[in-house]
């Protein structure tokens, strides 16, 4: 993951040492004629155990970061802890939102695409990020994941640019065929990008 601690001009998620200068990276990628995407979550932690756009602390620093329960790249790591159970505690929305701060930071870095990942997707958090991205001066493609509920398809069209309709793909025929051949009901909600 790219995520480090909160800070900078907006108190947004900053990069860890693996990505020392996201703006420079963006400029290099754009110079090659490509676009640059980023991954985040409206939870306090992502599926990969890095910080997300919410926190239980008003300063945005999650307790596990304050307690030092992370590796050198600020990924959750607690010696002697139950890694999988502890990580599940991150899969929730915290008391404080830093969505606007994160969106402003990504716009400053010239990010082109956001994959916003949590499950189940809900209108409040979808719209919150939509509004934050639209308030920046950058056109950022907004993709939600995963398993966007079909019943809310009209909302996804209104507030996102793209959405994922299934869980992870596996290297089995059942997985490939169910993902590839059982998505017809989504067709009425497709359109040009």
For the regions a language model picked out, list residue spans one by one.
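Generic structural hydrophobic/aromatic packing signal, biased to beta-strands
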Residues: 36, 106, 129, 142-144, ...
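Glycan-recognition surfaces
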Residues: 73-79, 90, 124, 141-193
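Extracytoplasmic, non-cytosolic globular domains
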Residues: 110-114, 118-148
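Aromatic-lined carbohydrate-binding/catalytic grooves of carbohydrate-active enzymes
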Residues: 1-123
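Residue-level signal for the start and early helices of compact helical domains
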Residues: 10, 97, 133, 154-156
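Extracellular/periplasmic catalytic domains that process cell-envelope and extracellular macromolecules
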Residues: 29-32, 107-108, 134-137, 155-157
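Short secondary-structure boundary/capping segments
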Residues: 53-55, 129-130, 156-163
